[in-house]
Amino acid sequence: MDYKKGEHSPSSSIQILSDDATINSNYAYGEQLQSNDQYNNIQHPAPSFANPFIHEQDDSYSDILEEEPDEDAYDSPERPSSTEEFISQDESNISAGSSFMFPYNRGHPLSKRHDSIMVDEFGHEYIVEGDSIASADEAIDYDALYASWTAETKAPILAIDIENIYIELAMKFGFQWDNMRNMFDYLMVMLDSRASRMTPQEALLTLHADYIGGPQSNFKKWYFACKMDQFDLKSGVLSFISRDPSTQVPYKDMSSCEALWISRMDELSNYERIEQLALYLLCWGEANNVRFMPECLCFIYKVAYDYLISPSFKEQKNPAPKDYFLDNCITPLYNLMHDQQYEIRDQKYVRKEKDHASIIGYDDINQMFWYSKGLKALLLSDGSRIMDADVASRYFLLADIQWQRVCYKSFRESRTWLHFLHNFSRIWILHISVFWYFTVYNSPTIYTPNFHYLEGTQPARAAKWCAPALAGAVASFISFLALILEAYFVPRNNPGAQPVIPRLIFVSILIALNIVPAAFIFGFSNATQQHYRSREIVGYVHFFFSIGCVAYQSFIPLPFLLGPRFKFRSSSRKYLANSYFTNDIASLPWGRTLLSAALWITVFIAKFVESYYFLTLSVRDPIRFLQRMKPYDCYDFMIGASLCSHQPKFLLSLVYLTDLVLFFLDTYLWYMLISTMFSIAYSFYMGSAIWTPWRVIFSNLPRRIYFTLLAYKDLSTEFKPKIYVGQIWNSIMISMYREHLLSLEHLKGLLYQQVGSEYFGKQTFQSPKFFMEAAKGLNKWDAFFRRNSEAERRISFFAQSLGGKIPDAVPVPKMPSFTVLIPHYGEKILLSLREIIREQDPMSRITLLEYLKQLYPNDWDNFVQDTKLMAGDVGVEETKSDVKSEKGKKQGTVKEDLPFYCIGFKSTAPEYTLRTRIWASLRSQTLYRTASGMMNYSRALKLLYRVEQPNLLDDCDGNFERLEHQLEQMAYRKFRLCISMQRYAKFNRDEYENAEFLLRAHPELQIAYLDQDPSEDGEEPKVYATLINGFCPFENGRRLPKYRIRLSGNPILGDGKADNQNMALPFVRGEYLQLIDANQDNYIEECMKIRNVLSEFEEMDCATLTPYTKKGNARHPVAMLGAREYVFSENSGILGDVAAGKEQTFGTLFSRSLALIGGKLHYGHPDFLNTIFMTTRGGVSKAQKGLHVNEDIYAGMTALQRGGRIKHCDYFQCGKGRDLGFGTIINFTTKIGTGMGEQSLSREYFYLGTQLPFFRMLSFYYAHAGFHLNNVFIMISMQLLMLVFVNLGAMYHTVEICDYQAGAAINASLYPPGCYMLKPVLDWIRRCIISIFIVFFISFLPLVVHDLLEKGVIRAVARLCKQIFSLSPMFEVFVTQNYANSIFTNLTYGGARYIATGRGLATTRVPFSVLYSLYTGSSIYLGSRLIMMLLFGTMTVWTTHYVYFWVTMFALVICPFIYNPHQFSFVDFFVDYREFLRWLSRGNTKGHAHSWIGFCRLARTRITGVNRKVKGSPSNKLTMDMPRAGLRNVIFTEVFLPACFAFFTICAYTFMNSQPGLEDKSRAVNGFIRIWIMAALPIAISTAALLILLMFSCMLGPLLRKCSKRYGAVLAALAHAVSVFGLVFTFEALWFLEAWSFSKTVLGCIVIFAIHRLVFKLVVVFLLPREVASGENNYSWWDGHWFGRKGIPYMPIQFIREFMCKVVEMNLFAMDFILSHCILFSLTPILCIPFIDIPHSVLLFWLHPSRQIRPPIYTRKQNQLRRRTFYRYSLLFFALLCTFVAMIVVPLVLDQKLSYQFKFENSVKFFRLMQPSLGVLPNTNKNTSE
């Protein structure tokens, strides 16, 4: 009992150490695993203190402290007046015997708590209720389970009556029995949750309003949007709006119909409300994939309800057929969706080769139900319409609807970049128009007649105003294009399609009004007339009119150009559905609206000022000189001056285009800067920055715990606040100790303890030394936790987070219930012992356990001490000392302790090995870590409930078992953890045992999974959504399910995750849902904030008005609440740190500012969702295959469109794992990039981009699509600059360059005469390089600022330095290119899919061939092209700014190898080289999973597609799922862009070889023809070799195949060798023909490769049919076995096709061979540095050299084999290196020895193909400029 004032007992005790409610139970095995015999003996030793009041207790209880109360201990019922009352050492009275300090663990047998108990064959207890299997919640009566919904609480309708309603509905409608049971519990938990904080009547009323009738309910919006009220009024039967069928109202009078709706809802009886809710939930619970279509579900529910209220329902006596609802209402829709994506081939379902624009998806079907026209189109098999049928019979006619006939595409997700043009037309209008203003104003030479640079001619004022004013026409033209695209993307048969023609006419008028003044000035006014005053006035009016046009079209969304059409009138509801479901945007409060406007106004002011002065003014002089520059005396023998004379114009066009791209780039730069500043300011405003003095943070922490975490207004005043605070604080500290984050010595200084006082027989409750030191301002944290440790981070964030603005906590019984949902597919559940202590890969040098020990040395030391204490191998005195130093530990450790420090155990008993497995699993990215962390919610709730209810034990009559049961019951009422284990039924033995371990550790944990019955002959197997928990009994070794609900079929129609979540949604409980990934974590101290977090949804207050009044609350609900995340993998090396930094800045810094300005969406982990809001609007994600690969973000867009508010919580965080290896990080960025490409095609982007207000549209764009397009623009700008380098270098190398002074007069003469003024272009290039450099490195700013706020200056600077010295800028370049390539390839080829990125520790060396094949297409090819161009630019027009580009370009090529673990291990390098050569050569005579030919064919398949009609197993990695790319996209990407690249390089080459300045045209040479001949030469050589070898294979193949199986491989190797020789010979020949000019030869190689690339793309795109998946054609080519081989259809066609393929492949092989060896040679200097592997490993893993990873251990045979391989292949490698060097050196030496004269006369002998060596030939009598 609890003692009151003046009472005390000398023997009073308080519980101080607990397990479950206070401590993360990762190691509290004795309590967690009571049901598992093999684990029964595991116990975690409790820490022992040198305190006479602490003593050991048995396993069921914890240590206790005794203290006598002081008479004045509980005087103040109000808030404490000062911090001292929390941390002072006065004598606080602690109740005797109340045991209120901490709640006890679960772990008592069920038989001690329940009467009806059975035991399975394994001795596991479970509860049985009748014939059904029930968990602990169902074993007791409804009053105990739903404590707030009972007769005592005046529930308007009792649970038993609600159950009867469910039973009746299930029987008469044909719902499944388990669905009925599940949905009954679903509704009751929801009612119980609401009734806990308001009256049951209010709970029912508000719940009904949220689901059915309230102003924000989705059903009500659908009801009026599709004009269902008019259907009901016409039918004259009972409906949602009229109780009296004779009621007459005007059909189109919406206000009258709404009044009838409100009246009807208000008149409903409680029975009817329950009936409506139950029917809706039953429909929803059994709808499986139809849950993704909320309005379709509304229609089904409405039809069902019409039958419910009809007389036929009351007259129905017999139950409906089994599963009637599923088979007749849901399955036809499921079959429609399934058949849209799959077809049957060879008696198997295969995915159709259709892209999104040809697939009727979820949204297309759902959108049909938005409009009355769509409902009227629902045809039955007899041709009639369902809406014409009798209302009561419609439910039974649902199965007769011809879904295939009535459904149509409502939006075309065509794969094109034009979606960006349409969706964000306002972005392009604003930027391109302003760019036009700036650039045209600074390009006066273009519109100045008779301009001459010596005269400094200036344009007329009219022209100077009118030319920039054409920006209005540009803006209007962009709008015109966007409207044309809208007419295409939105089919005109869509009832919601807005008319386009009126807006087209309006925009056309704007275009005309902007063009006419310019035509008048420039077309109908001569140079003299342009100076007239009247023309000036026209120019002024035109200019300001254009500004108005640009501003109007920038700010006004495209659909609203002629007015806000969505704002419906009472007489028309045509666009009401669009308003409700696409544009119901919750407006921001005025303060945040002004903040958003201020942010973007600041961004654009800074951007436009910087762009004008830094970019535009710097391009003014290049434009002035290049526009009027005319090269003289340049000539080619074949094409004359047709190309070279226009070289300045080509260069100018590249300058303009590059400047435009850079103009887009710096907007994102300024957005990042200003957004970061706003986020910083808000962080200080909220008080969450570390810059608050630590003395204030920690000294105020007890006070903040009391007023923030506890419901202090409802606390008993009998106890001082310190008593409450002490329990909370001690729980957190002990939890960290149990997680081995704190040592025992540290723990002692962090706990509240009882010490003796000066009063006899009394105890004082002493504050921890930690708080006392903080109050004194002493900075002695080392005495309490290690610096930079996980404990310090968690304590620091906990203290900082409580200093901000946080809602008050409500008592636990009054808090809403919630569920954590974790989708799981193949992620590790619990690491096995084999995975921990054995190397998992032959290329790995370390075991997982060893690596984790090096990453977490202090945690491991604590774990070892704990294990030794448990095993009895350490004394008490040893536990008092702190952990020894590394040296001291080695000296003090005897042989018996070595097993502990090596593997964590000495005995192989399961209880010891399990501890090591768990220790490693809790430091890896495993499901066990996630589930264990999330179960902290249960522990926190039990703790908070026990702490805030000191009299709880008295209420239980001192029975601790009853107390524990009551705590568990409360936690179970408020929190559920559901893991959606899609594959559970197909788990192997290890996976099943691990899942079973989870259930035994946490019996209340729920697992939802897919199960199926064995298929019968001719029938598909029946699939079930199944739920189990730890209380379910076993049958045949498997747990019997609690619920088993049949589905229409396999629900995984999409990419998996969204379908998996949707399958589990009916099994979640409560009002809110937290979505968690399977690689996250949570902490006890964060879980204690859950009540504050849920208060952010603003639904805690009781309803003061009924929602069914005109004054009812119509405020937009909070749909989502974002939270921070801490990436716990940040200390795992450079790549883990970079990935963590990205996640932290986006998840915290930018999310904070985005939530303020209304741009935040849902990004999955760890966001909280409003369950009712989201489930009634399509669920928590979307699931169309490919289109919704980034499934989470669509839920955010749906919530934003449909009226939900999205907030961000900055004081709560969860742990998050991130990818740690190079490959996994790149896979993740690829998934995000391709997902962005798919998002751009979606209708969500269409609606949001075109309808959001201007400032919110900017926030939405730059937070999502703008980031990815910025990466695209960065890479485009780099490639454009390289083209500028090439074209400028070609001119710089061959002409005389003028002297240039930036401050010279505009009409200064050029010197020397005949020179070319090109230096301004070089100056402009320098500025461009600086711009790109700043854009790249500004990406580090958010992370630095984040660390400054969260960690302080020293750690922020240290982290930045570590990243820079670890070459992370190079990695950023590579990631940027990968992002750009991902979105680029996705919009060209499609094929977006969910990529399993991998969550292991990256310590394995990846073979060179794997890295090369993975990253050539995305980066290495591009990097190699750019390096060649940069090399040419460096040799011709050098500037020191190129140094940055050299680093950047090399990063694109060598990054995968730099970040490959142990890449520079000397022996491994050459062993790997052998594997690389084998990769190049194999796969030509038999299939191989990893070969160059397979890599080549896979790349080609993206364009050609796969021949699906050919039977046979696919070889290599050819996929049957990816559709063939659209020809339109392929032509743009694979033909047009390479053609542009080839054109500009050919122009540069032609000018460089046109001998400018040579007046005698008869001495011109064939430079243009030369390069085409050189490009054709290697193709001709390889073609000739192929034909010759083909004859051998066909004639001798049948004979030689019998002699040698390697006959074909030898021919293939010979052909490949010839192709390499042909390419090398071409290079040497070109070098000779260029008169040994290396710069011209490099440019020639650039052109040759550009021509090859274009030609090969043309062949693949236009000439090659589909690829044969089996690869038999390739084998037949080399071995000559064409006849009789399976898998070769239409042999003549395939023969011709294979010949073209082989010509392409031979030349690609030669380029790959040379490129790959160039990369290897570039790595050789680093390889030759002694012991380079050690510093390289330090760079990658951030491990101290003393903790370096050991070399692998091989057997003698393996060592001998490796040694032979090393000698052979190192010799071959260096021989090839010498050969490559000789190809460069030998020609130079021969040139010096032979002294060959490269004169024109000798060139004539070579048909003018040789370039004469003439040098620069300036003509002083001619000028290049006018």
UniProtKB/Swiss-Prot annotation:
Membrane topology, as annotated: Multi-pass membrane protein
Compositional bias (Polar residues): 34-43
Pfam families: FKS1_dom1, FKS1_dom2, Glucan_synthase
Record keywords, A-Z: Glycosyltransferase, Membrane, Phosphoprotein, Transferase, Transmembrane, Transmembrane helix
Residues recorded as bearing Phosphoserine in the entry: S885
Biased composition annotated in UniProt, kind: Acidic residues: 59-75
Catalysed reactions listed for this entry: [(1->3)-beta-D-glucosyl](n) + UDP-alpha-D-glucose = [(1->3)-beta-D-glucosyl](n+1) + UDP + H(+)
Record-annotated membrane-spanning stretches: 427-447, 465-485, 504-524, 543-563, 597-617, 637-657, 660-680, 1272-1292, 1329-1349, 1375-1397, 1417-1437, 1438-1458, 1531-1551, 1571-1591, 1607-1627, 1642-1662, 1701-1721, 1770-1790
Enzyme nomenclature, EC number: 2.4.1.34
Cellular localisation: Membrane
GO cellular component, one term: plasma membrane
Family in the record: Belongs to the glycosyltransferase 48 family.
Assembly information from the UniProt record: Component of the 1,3-beta-glucan synthase (GS) complex, composed of at least the alternate catalytic subunits bgs1, bgs2, bgs3, and bgs4, and a regulatory subunit chr4.
Protein's UniProt name: 1,3-beta-glucan synthase component bgs3
Species, as recorded: Schizosaccharomyces pombe (strain 972 / ATCC 24843)
